[in-house]
């Protein structure tokens, strides 16, 4: 409650002097309230919200609270009403003893702006204490010859209350021998004295009993009594006398317990019992007997407990000396306690932030504390310091308040916890200090993006990997903490060969493990460029990127593919021509193969596995060239079969084989003449041919043996002439259509027909039979076979000879002329200047087959001009089609041919570096064959 007016002091109002200033600045005035002691808990003291210019609800919002400097909290704030109320029972005498005015001061802290407001509350005394005597029995000895009017001091009563509530009067029970006199001391204390009114007579009454009553001025007044026992003794005409009316001593507060402080001394001139003096305390508080000891015989005063300047700096007491009969006198004792530096400074935290964000601006207040030292003077002067290497500084506020503020930017990643040591030192000698540690946690903010150890990575994975296999572990680091350091991984959206990157690989968003979603094929995909993004979980989130190159490593999963000679589709056997005049080292043909793999897996080597005539042919290990190993002999068979293996150098190695049929002859007529010794290949066409022959022979033999033979010969002769005429005129209408076998968009090389020559021994007539083809150089399609009228064609050589003048070969079409370099073969063995392309459609294929058939017909007539040089298969330059590897797939670059300069290019060249021989030589040989 507010202080009430008292006397002329106008304190019936609350004095509020407020000077507005910057945060942390002190108010120039103080707020004064008053409250009576012993009020109930929660009693109203003052409207603090109104006096601070706030609404009650703002007390909690702005963090208004009481700071009491370590003393027991006597007051509290009512957050609802905005009032200052009592926190419990208040005892004025306990707080201020007998001080005339009892003020309790504390501060109000407004935390939002760190403002301090000093508050004073005056504790109003109430009459809650009864005057009490030090002892309830007072013994007084009076000589019987004592004259009336003599005064005998009595023990006074004490009342802790002040003002009118303190001790005001004494009363003595009615008695005819005694009266009561009251004396007042300099400090206003009242001392009762017993006045002798009439002479005592010991023989009449030895003991007198009186009652002394002490009363205060409260409303209602309170009182207590003490019993006085007056003993009448014999005459004692001297009283003790102290050597000094007042004794003074000054001692330091740290004197040991039991130290003698001083000695009081009184003299009594009487002798015997009347002269024996005893000492005792007269006017002391209840606490003094616990602090000091007075030797009743010697008058020595010593300490019973340690002195504490901070509790009591000055003691005042009275001692009395009494002789045997009871005469007494009194003296005052003053003890002054000197302060020594025995208390270290104390640090009291008023406001402290246990955690601050790392982006806190400079000058932010993070702590408010109060320094105090219970010592006085220089011993109580306190200074405070912190280490210099910290991003903080101390600023002094009002009284002994200090604030701790930031001076530099904080970085949690550099230092996340600060141990701030506050060292408070007093000015004593020697100085005392105390350290207080403040642990300041720096809260993280998302100021660091995730980082990868490297900006790019190269990862290698073998092809044919299993789906779902882990490829690589991507890791990123974030120097932040908690959610700000929680990283998730993702792949940037992109397309690879028209498909999204997510169809190739995936990434675990938590662990960063890359997984392959499909089995990679080196031949289709050799490299993937990925971009991995790492995001943290901060607000806002930060991210960084990393590029990853995923290289697919080749495995030996593709066997070599043979481009030449091309594998036929109808079961026929390929054939190459080797002249009998060929010398050792003559290039017969070249096996061309490629491997879709790369590196060692595509490094091919060639090996002759099997040959019908061992030692006759040799195959280049790295070139695939089939050459004669020795000169050809007459005993060497016309048909030579070679099995060539092509093997790569992978682990394990893969291989492919091809069977070559080499005809040993100088020209096609010679081949046609000697073809009877060659066994036709087993196939469906040969089976049908045999059946037709058997049926024809049986029919002729059984029914029309002679007639049918003649008639059939004539019919066949006419039919054959018409065919030759058509062929010589360039019509080529009856030439069967052939198809070529393709491999990887590369057309197969030209195939040749297999011929069987049947020579009868009985006449001039011989039959040249053209059965189903079985040579590698030409294939007859099923469609062509079905269009022919018959499968056998007979030619009478004698009749043809007679009819030569009537059958003239038409001049060849110049559009069909080809250079010698255009014969079937590989680009690596051709050195001609002309270049050409593979047949790329059915029309070109049929045209080439027609040329081959025409040349074969001329050779059968003996007037062929197709005599070829060595290795030309009897074809002249004009009919030698140009075949190169221009259209070989791109993987031909993978072919390694160690030890050779030959490469798979489009450049044409000569077969063996020799010019083709003229056609006349072959014609002569053909003539010889006819004579046979």
Curated annotation (Swiss-Prot):
Provide the transmembrane region boundaries: 693-713
* Region named Disordered: 804-841, 902-932
* Topology of this chain in the membrane: Single-pass type I membrane protein
Q: Does the keyword Glycoprotein apply?
A: yes
Q: Which residues form the signal peptide?
A: 1-28
- What Gene3D superfamilies does this protein map onto? Cadherins
Which sequence ranges are listed under topological domain Cytoplasmic?
A: 714-932
**Which GO terms label this protein's molecular function in UniProt?**
calcium ion binding
Q: Which InterPro entries match?
A: Cadherin-like_dom (IPR002126), Cadherin-like_sf (IPR015919), Cadherin_C (IPR032455), Cadherin_CBD (IPR031904), Cadherin_CS (IPR020894), Cadherin_N (IPR013164), Protocadherin/Cadherin-CA (IPR050174)
Alphabetical UniProt keywords: Calcium, Cell adhesion, Cell membrane, Glycoprotein, Membrane, Repeat, Signal, Transmembrane, Transmembrane helix
Instruction: Kindly list the GO CC terms recorded for this protein.
Output: plasma membrane
Stretches of Polar residues bias are at 806-841
Instruction: Name any Gene Ontology BP term.
Output: cell adhesion
Q: What is this protein called?
A: Protocadherin gamma-A7
Record the organism: Pan troglodytes
The gene it comes from is PCDHGA7
């Amino acid at each position: 409650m507010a202080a009430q007016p008292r006397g002329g002091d106008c304190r019936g109002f609350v004095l509020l002097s407020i000077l507005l200033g910057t945060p942390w600045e002190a108010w120039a005035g103080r707020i004064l309230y008053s409250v009576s002691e012993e009020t109930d808990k929660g009693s109203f003291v003052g409207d603090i919200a109104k006096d601070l210019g706030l609404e009650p609800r703002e007390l909690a919002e702005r963090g208004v609270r009481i700071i009491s400097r370590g003393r027991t909290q006597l007051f509290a704030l009512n957050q609802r009403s905005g009032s200052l109320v009592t926190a419990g029972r208040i005892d004025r005498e306990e707080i201020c003893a007998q001080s005339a005015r009892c003020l309790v001061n504390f501060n109000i802290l407004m935390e939002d702006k760190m403002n301090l407001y000093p508050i004073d509350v005056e504790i109003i005394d109430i009459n809650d204490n009864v005057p009490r005597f030090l002892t309830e029995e007072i013994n007084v000895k009076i000589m019987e010859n004592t004259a009336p009017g003599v005064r005998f001091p009595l023990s006074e009563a004490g009342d802790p209350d002040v003002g009118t509530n303190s001790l005001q009067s004494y009363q003595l029970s009615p008695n005819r021998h005694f009266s009561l006199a009251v004396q007042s001391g300099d400090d206003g204390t009242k001392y009762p004295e017993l006045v002798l009114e009439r002479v005592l007579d010991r023989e009449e009454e030895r003991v007198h009993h009186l009652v002394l009553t002490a009363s205060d001025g409260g409303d209602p007044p309170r009182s207590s009594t003490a019993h006085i026992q007056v003993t009448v003794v014999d005459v004692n005409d001297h009283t003790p006398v102290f050597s000094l009316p007042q004794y003074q001593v000054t001692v330091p507060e740290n004197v040991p317990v039991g130290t003698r402080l001083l000695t009081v001394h009184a003299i009594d001139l009487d002798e015997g019992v009347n002269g024996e003096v005893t000492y005792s305390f007269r006017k002391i508080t209840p606490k003094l007997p616990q602090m000091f000891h007075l030797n009743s015989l010697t008058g020595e005063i010593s300490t019973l407990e340690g002195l504490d300047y901070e509790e009591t700096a000055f003691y005042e007491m009275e001692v009395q000396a009494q002789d045997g009969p009871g005469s007494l006198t009194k003296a005052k004792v003053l003890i002054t306690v000197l302060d020594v530096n025995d208390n270290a400074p104390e640090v009291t935290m008023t406001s402290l932030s246990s955690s601050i964000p790392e982006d806190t601006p400079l000058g932010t207040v993070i702590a408010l504390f109060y320094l105090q030292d219970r010592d006085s003077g220089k011993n109580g002067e306190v200074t405070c310091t912190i280490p210099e290497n910290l991003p903080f500084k101390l600023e002094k506020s009002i009284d002994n308040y200090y604030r701790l503020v930031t001076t530099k930017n904080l970085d949690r990643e550099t230092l996340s916890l600060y141990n701030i040591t506050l060292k408070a030192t007093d000015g004593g000698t020697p100085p005392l200090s105390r350290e207080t540690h403040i642990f300041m946690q720096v809260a993280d903010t998302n100021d660091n993006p995730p980082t990868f150890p490297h900006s790019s990575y190269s990862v290698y994975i073998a092809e044919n990997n299993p789906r779902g296999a882990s490829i690589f572990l991507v890791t990123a680091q974030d120097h932040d903490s908690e959610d700000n350091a929680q990283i998730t991984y993702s792949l940037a959206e992109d397309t690879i060969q028209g498909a999204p990157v997510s169809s190739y690989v995936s990434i675990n968003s938590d662990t960063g493990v890359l997984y392959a979603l499909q089995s990679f094929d080196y031949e289709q995909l050799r490299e993937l460029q990925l971009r991995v993004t790492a995001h943290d979980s901060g607000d806002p989130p930060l991210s960084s990127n990393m590029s990853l190159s995923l290289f697919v490593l080749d495995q030996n999963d593709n066997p070599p593919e043979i481009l030449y000679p091309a594998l036929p589709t109808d079961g026929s056997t390929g054939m190459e021509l080797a002249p009998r005049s060929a010398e050792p080292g003559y290039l017969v043909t070249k096996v061309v193969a490629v491997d879709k793999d790369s590196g060692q897996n595509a490094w091919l080597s060639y090996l002759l596995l099997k040959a019908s005539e061992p030692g006759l042919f040799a195959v280049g290990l790295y070139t695939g060239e089939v050459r004669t190993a020795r000169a050809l002999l007459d005993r060497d068979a016309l048909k030579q079969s070679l099995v060539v293996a092509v093997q790569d150098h992978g682990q394990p190695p893969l291989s492919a084989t091809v069977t070559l049929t080499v005809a040993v002859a100088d020209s096609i007529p010679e081949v046609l003449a000697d073809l009877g010794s060659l066994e036709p290949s087993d196939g469906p066409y040969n089976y049908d041919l045999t059946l037709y022959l058997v049926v024809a022979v049986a029919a002729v033999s059984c029914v029309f043996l002679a007639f049918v033979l003649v008639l059939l010969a004539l019919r066949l002769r006419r039919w054959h002439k018409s065919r030759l005429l058509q062929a010589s005129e360039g019509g080529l209408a009856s030439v069967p259509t052939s198809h070529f076998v393709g491999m990887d968009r590369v057309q197969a090389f030209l195939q040749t027909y297999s011929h069987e020559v049947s020579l009868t021994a009985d006449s001039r007539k011989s039959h040249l039979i053209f059965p189903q083809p079985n040579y590698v150089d030409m294939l007859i399609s099923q469609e062509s076979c079905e269009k022919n009228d018959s499968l056998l064609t007979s030619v009478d050589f004698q009749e043809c000879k007679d009819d030569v003048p009537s059958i003239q070969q038409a001049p060849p079409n110049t559009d069909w002329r080809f250079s010698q370099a255009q014969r079937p073969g590989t680009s690596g063995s051709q050195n001609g200047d002309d270049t050409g392309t593979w047949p790329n459609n059915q029309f070109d294929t049929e045209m080439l087959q027609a040329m081959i058939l025409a040349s074969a017909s001329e050779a059968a007539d003996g007037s062929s001009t197709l005599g070829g040089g060595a290795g030309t298969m009897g074809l002249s330059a004009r009919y030698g089609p140009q075949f190169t590897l221009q259209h070989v797939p791109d993987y031909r670059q993978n072919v390694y041919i160690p030890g050779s300069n030959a490469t798979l290019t489009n450049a044409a060249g000569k077969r063996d570096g020799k010019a083709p021989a003229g056609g006349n030589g072959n014609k002569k040989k053909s003539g010889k064959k006819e004579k046979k």
